[in-house]
Amino acid sequence: DETVRRFAALTPAAPDFRIFWDNAYAIHHLYDDRQDQLLEILSECEKAGHPDMVFEFCSTSKVTFAGAGIAAIASSKANLDDMRKSMTIQTIGYDKINQLRHVRYFKDINGVREHMKKHAAIMRPKFEAVLKVLEEELGGLGIGTWTKPNGGYFISFDSMEGCAKAIVAKCKEA
């Protein structure tokens, strides 16, 4: 939450500075009982007096079909009005058939949540296997740290200074 507030409180020198906020993993939870919730940046920017500073993006590209999902943009009215001016001449229209496919398949937010539970059932064992190996092989050695995410699709690993090239080389050997 503190990081979101710090972004919202930025006072950039350039009047057209914008934050492009990719909220890609908002619904990608691995566990029903442990779900990270990020503070909502649009309202925080508005509270901080910078309602036009952020464009927030989301899509179903990691929910349904990569490259064939549907996407959305959230921002201030002024930003959206400005964006509509250029979007009107950049595209002949949205893929309404694909939008209809998504609506018919999911029906509502509960359908999306149930679908994401299926994703979690596939992803959770993979995350847990990687975390188990990291802990068994590297835990307690003080040579690296890693995240234990509650969602998303990545585990971040931080190694000791100067080890990245050797780690990448070892990964290529595997």
Question: Residue locations for each model-derived region?
Answer:
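Alpha-helical scaffold elements within enzyme catalytic domains, especially in hydrolases
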Residues: 9-10, 122, 133, 170
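Conserved core segment of the aminotransferase class I/II
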Residues: 43-124, 136
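Short beta-strand segments
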Residues: 20-23, 58, 72-74, 147-148, ...
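Conserved glycine-rich beta-strand-loop-beta hairpin in the small C-terminal domain of fold type I
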Residues: 116-131, 143-158
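Conserved C-terminal alpha-helix-loop-beta "cap" of PLP-dependent enzymes
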Residues: 80, 84, 154-174
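Active-site pre-lysine segment of PLP-dependent enzymes
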Residues: 1-66
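Hydrophobic alpha-helical bundle segments that form small-molecule/ligand-binding pockets
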Residues: 137-143
